[in-house]
A protein has these predicted regions:
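Long, charged low-complexity segments
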Residues: 1-3, 72-164
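Structural motif corresponding to the C-terminal cap of alpha-helices
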Residues: 42, 61, 102-105
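Charged alpha-helical initiation segments
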Residues: 1-47, 155-165
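Hydrophobic/aromatic-lined pockets within catalytic cores
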Residues: 43, 62, 66, 125-128, ...
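Alpha-helix boundary/capping and short turn/kink residues
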Residues: 47, 66-67, 106, 110
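Hydrophobic alpha-helical packing segments in soluble, helical-rich domains
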Residues: 49-73, 79
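Short runs of predominantly hydrophobic/aromatic residues within well-ordered alpha helices
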Residues: 31, 50, 54, 58, ...
Length: 165
């Protein structure tokens, strides 16, 4: 497989897993445990159990983040508003695949379950790893900027590297 070439589901099993596929300890324990269980069910071929665990992980995340709304979709929309830097496509996938199973479709097939768990892992990585890391980087930059400006009597206006701190 060449760089820039799309990953096929069969290839995804042989490549070294990206960092975001390992659920970080900063992710709320209830969500993390459900995702581990969903992965275990998927590997064992228990698609109904995996589907229930993955969908419960989404619900647990919504509860943990106090995402309110009249429907599952509205709650995910509220979460997307809380974290605007998280790609909207991840929320769309959770809306499409993460709602509770119905009698007609009790379980996702293996590929769709994998897509849901990976989308959720990426979302969690964005929220609980990249977001806090971004805040730390910007705070550090702000401190550097403030030390530069306090040492020099610049005539230029003060620049704020991190306006929402």
């Amino acid at each position: 497989m060449q760089r820039g070439e799309p990953i096929r589901m069969a290839d995804a099993h042989h490549a070294a897993p990206p960092a975001f596929l390992n659920v970080d300890p900063r992710v709320p324990p209830g969500v993390r445990e459900l995702l581990v269980e969903a992965d275990g069910c998927l590997k064992a071929g228990f698609l109904t159990g995996g589907t229930v665990c993955a969908q419960k992980a989404v619900q647990t995340l919504l509860t943990h983040e106090a995402a309110e709304g009249a429907s599952f979709e509205a709650r995910l929309h509220a979460l997307s508003q809380k974290y605007p830097s998280v790609p909207q496509s991840l929320f769309a996938l959770c809306i499409r695949l993460g709602d509770s199973p119905s009698r007609e479709h009790p379980a996702l097939d293996g590929d769709r379950l994998k897509v849901l768990t990976v989308a959720l892992k990426i979302m969690l990585y964005e929220i609980y790893v990249l977001g806090p890391d971004r805040v730390e980087r910007l705070k550090y930059l702000q401190q550097l900027l403030e030390s530069c400006e306090s040492g020099a009597h610049s005539k230029s206006p003060t620049v704020v590297a991190f306006p929402n701190a």
